[in-house]
Amino acid sequence: MSLAQRLRPAEGDPEGALVLLHGRGTDENDLFPLLDELDPDRRLLGATARGPLSLPPGGSHWYVIRQVGSPDPETFHATYALAGGWLDGLLAEHGIPPERAILGGFSQGAAMTHALGLDAGRPRLAGLIALSGFIPQVEGFELGDVTGLPVAIGHGIYDPVISVEFGREARDRLIQAGADVTYRESPMPHTIDPAFLADLRGWVSARVPAAA
């Protein structure tokens, strides 16, 4: 089993990849427009994936919620393995090394981004974008060597779903571990700040510079 996906081709040969993971209750179409927001020149292969678990009456998610910050271990680890295999296969199929791939997500997708991008057993990526999420607290997840790893974190100050404290905790933990953290708080609820997205265009371009 793999993940349903939607691809946005690069204009020419892809110079890297930009992969985005949606939040709870939506699907691979939700963040698809952000691929062009973040990579307007289409230098990168763009991809979005659908979480493997279904929610009635529609939409998908990545894991069962026990409490905010601590996913259900059984569904989390099953999805972690599935999503990791999908991501690795996508990059291999298109000949893109992990160090030229950016992974990002919103809400549950941000938690999965942290898991897939920070875990000790995973390949090092070019950068991570975590919007309104958290670093998951779950048995079996171990923070790897993140020294110098670019991580962009955005969070709404008035987020009633995932408190901004989770964003601050992720920021502080990653800075302490040596990551290169870009952090933005915005005066809004559980949503994505378009101004931060605009600022991230340059960040994305710098993380995957033009091939020599």
Model-derived features: positions:
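Gly/Ala-rich beta-loop-alpha elbow adjacent to hydrolase catalytic centers
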Residues: G105-G109, T113
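C-terminal catalytic histidine-bearing segment of alpha/beta-hydrolase fold enzymes
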Residues: E165-A212
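Short beta-strand immediately N-terminal to the catalytic nucleophile in serine-hydrolase-like folds
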Residues: L103-G105, L131
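A conserved short beta-strand
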Residues: P123-I135
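Flexible "cap/lid" loop of the alpha/beta hydrolase fold
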Residues: G58-I65, G133-V151
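Active-site signature of alpha/beta-hydrolase-fold catalytic machinery across serine-
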Residues: P33, A115-D119
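Serine-hydrolase catalytic machinery in alpha/beta-hydrolase-like enzymes
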Residues: M1-R100
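Short beta-strand/loop motif that positions the catalytic acidic residue
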Residues: A152-H155, D159
